[in-house]
Amino acid sequence: MELSTAFDTILSDLAGGASILWLALAGVVLIVWDIFRNNAPVLPWLACLVVAGAAIIEVFRLGDPSSTVFFSLIQTGGPASFVSLVILISAFCSIVLSVPYLARIKHGYGEVYALILFATSGMVMLGTANNMVTVFVGLETMSIALYILTGLVRSDEGAMESALKYFLLGAFSTGFFLYGIALMYGATGTMYFTEMASGYAGSELQPLFWVGVALFLVGFLFKVAAVPFHMWTPDIYQGAPTTLTGFMATASKTAAFAALVLVLYHGIGTLAPGDGQWQLALALVALVTVVMGNILALNQDNVKRMLAYSSIAHAGYVLIALAAGTSEAYAGAVYYLLIYALMNIGAFGVMALLEWDGKEGRVQTLDSLSGIGFKKPLLGVTRGVFMFSLTGFPPLGGFFGKLAVFAPAVNAGLTWLAIVGVLASVFSGYYYLRVLYVFWMKSPDADDSAARSADFSVPRTSSIVIVGCAVLLLVIGLVPGLRDLTLSFFAQGGLAALP
C-alpha cells in the first residue's frame, strides 16, 4: 500500500511539473540534434512545438484548483498556469521572430533555441515557485541562459561587452539575493512562503529577518530593472540581438514579478499588515523607478535604448500595485504583465524587422526610420498600436492594464503614488509618439538606411506574430468581459485559493 501511494505521488509530481521537465529535456534533445545536424533549419520549429506543447498543458490546468507538487516546492494550476502561459507565449513569439532575424545576421546557431528552452524552463519554475530554493534554482537557470544569449553575436564587441556586464552584475545581485534568503531562513526556520508567518511569530531574530528581506529585495529589484538597480538595462538591451532582447524584456520580467508577488502575498506581506514599512519602501522604489525611467527615455535617439528605459518605467508601474499589498493589487500586477508582454513582443518584433535591412547598415536610430510607415504600412500601423498602448491610450490593452495597477493603489490609500503613475504615463507620450512622428511624418534624408532600402520583405511568420499581438491588445481593450474575467480569476478564484 505504501509503495502504491509513493508511486502515485511520483506520478502526480511528474504530471504537475510536466511543463518544466518537458522544456528542459527538449532543450537537451535539441543540443544533441544540433551536434549531428549542425544548424538544421528544423530546430526553431521543433522548439516552437515544444513550447506549444507546454502551453497546451497549462491551458488545461487553468481551471484546476491551485496545488503543489515535488514536496510543495512548485505550484500548479490556477494562477500558476496563467503565469506560465504568459511566459510560454513570450517564448513562442520570440522564437518565431528570431528565425528570420538570426538568419539575416548569419547567427542562426542551433544552440540558441535550446538556450531559449532552458531559460523558459527556469522562468516557469521561478514564476510558479513555492519555496526560496525553487526561486533560486529557477532564477539562476533563467539567468545563465540569458547571459549566453546576450553575447550570441561573438563578432560584435558591443554584444560581448553587454554579456560581460550582465554576467558580472547578475552574479553580484545573486550574492545579495542568497544572503537575504539565508538570513530569512535563519530567522524563521523555513524556506516555504506559506510558513514564514508562523516561523516569524515565534522567532527571537525578527530584526535579522527584515535585514534578509532587504537583501532579498535588492536581488529581485535588480532582476526587474528597478531604480537604483537599473543601469545595466540599456547596455544589455542595445547589445543583445533584438528578438532575444524582447524575450528578456517580457518573459524574464514576468517570471521575476510573479515570484515576487507570491513571496509578498504568502510570506512577507502577511507578517506586518498593520506596520506597512515594507509597503512604504516599495512605494518609494516604485516612485523613483517610474519617474527616472520616463525621464531617461526622453532624449534617447537609439530606439532600443528608449525601449530599455521604457521597460524600467513599466517595472515601476507593476511595483505600484505591489506596494498596495492587496489581493486586488496583486491580481492587477499579474494582469498588467500579460499586457506588457504583448506590447513589448510586438514593439521589439517590429524593431527586429527594421534593424537589419539586408545591407551593411544597422537601423537603430530614430532618424534611420524616417518615413518607413508609408513604405511598410503593416509595420507602421502595428507600431502605432504598440506605442499608443505603451502610453496608455484607451481603448487599447495598455490603458486597462494601467487601470488595473493604479486603481488598487488608490483603494489602498496610495492615491499620491497612483497620481504620479498617471502623470508619468502622460509624460511618456512624448517619446512614444515621437517614434510615430518619425515613422509617418518625417521625410527621410537621402543617406538614411531606411531610404536606401525600403524593399526588404516582411516574413509571413513575423507578420502573424506582430499582427496577433496588436489584435490581442485591441481585443483586451474592446472586450471588457475578458479583462474582468481575468482579474476576478486572480482576485477571487486564483490568488485567494493558493495553498
Can you name each region flagged by the protein language model?
Residues 1-499:
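Alpha-helical transmembrane segments of multi-pass membrane proteins predominantly involved
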